[in-house]
A protein has these predicted regions:
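Glycine- and acidic-residue-enriched helix-capping/strand-helix junction motifs
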Residues: 1-9
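Ser/Thr/Gly-rich flexible loops in soluble cytosolic domains mediating phosphotransfer, phosphorylation
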Residues: 9, 69-102
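Short beta->alpha junction loops
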Residues: 25-34, 86-89
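Catalytic-face loop-and-helix region of soluble metabolic enzyme cores
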Residues: 27, 62, 82
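Mid-chain, well-packed structural core segment of small domains
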Residues: 37-75
Length: 102
């Protein structure tokens, strides 16, 4: 998937979050040592009911350590938030809907 397709999918997801009446933020991370501090800063900025973690973090086998680090950072920084997983950028609202009240 190209960066262009990812950003287009994120734009669709943000529209779908808004249509459901939910406030949403995008927190992009790099696949390096800056990922965990970036997640921690984002989650410290306010309270979240759900955090959706995209396939770009979850799926590459070489990214398993990054995935574990991100999950643990979310768990520590937002212990009350549900954790959801999308299958593509534009279904993030559906992923959150599985865990958030209608």
């Amino acid at each position: 998937m190209t960066a262009e397709k990812i950003h287009a999918g994120i734009a669709v997801a943000m529209k779908l979050f808004a249509e459901r009446g939910w406030e949403a933020d995008v927190g992009l991370i790099r696949p390096d040592e800056s990922a965990v501090p970036t997640v921690e800063r984002q989650l410290a900025s306010k309270s979240y009911d759900c955090v959706v973690i995209g396939a770009g973090v979850r799926l590459p086998p070489r990214g398993l350590a990054l995935f574990e680090a991100v999950i643990n950072a979310v768990h520590k920084a937002a212990p009350g938030a549900a954790i959801a997983f999308n299958t593509r950028p534009d279904d993030s609202a559906d992923a959150a809907a599985r865990w958030l009240p209608a």
